[in-house]
From Swiss-Prot:
A cellular component annotation (GO) from this entry: cytoplasm
Pfam entry (one): Prefoldin
Major location (coarse): cytoplasm
Gene: pfdA
Complexes and interactors: Heterohexamer of two alpha and four beta subunits.
A GO BP entry: protein folding
Species, as recorded: Methanococcus aeolicus (strain ATCC BAA-1280 / DSM 17508 / OCM 812 / Nankai-3)
Protein's UniProt name: Prefoldin subunit alpha
Places the protein is found: Cytoplasm
Length: 144
């Protein structure tokens, strides 16, 4: 019986790790959404001849003036860049935010489902341990 309890205990730990990984994914999604929202705010608030900072990497920036605030250049992947109207980019970013919201909702549902299974497993495990204690007159030990 101890072997069965150990196996269930390890399974319970696996569910806990799965929930933790899902929560980390959810945090990444929230960060991506925040970055997109910040980009939308920046693009919509940009004015011609406004001073801006251009990131050079490694925490270094260069001062510049915005020359054309109606268009932006976006990376399309594999060193391909496209010039697009800001309004089109905002639409694209809002669509990405919607997609991230859907993915986040799916992850939340999976977290809830996994947590529910783990909670039931924990209850079953506790009941088995209590039953063993009653039969043995003492506390069983889980060997790890």
């Amino acid at each position: 019986m101890n072997e069965e309890l150990q196996q269930q205990y390890y399974q319970l730990e696996m569910y806990g790790q799965q929930v933790q990984k899902l929560q980390e994914e959810l945090e990444k999604i929230e960060l991506m959404k925040m970055e997109l929202l910040k980009s939308i705010d920046s693009m919509e608030g940009l004015k011609d001849s406004e001073d801006i900072l251009i990131p050079l990497g490694g925490g270094a920036f260069i001062k510049a003036k915005a020359m054309d605030t109606k268009k932006v250049i976006m990376g399309a992947g594999a060193d391909v860049f496209l010039e697009k109207d800001i309004s089109d980019v905002v639409v694209d970013f809002n669509k990405s935010i919607e997609d991230l919201d859907k993915a986040g909702s799916m992850i939340i549902a999976k977290i809830e489902e996994t947590a529910k299974v783990a909670e039931q497993m924990q209850k079953d495990l506790e009941e088995k341990v209590q039953a063993m204690e009653g039969q043995m007159g003492g506390a069983p030990t889980l060997q790890m």
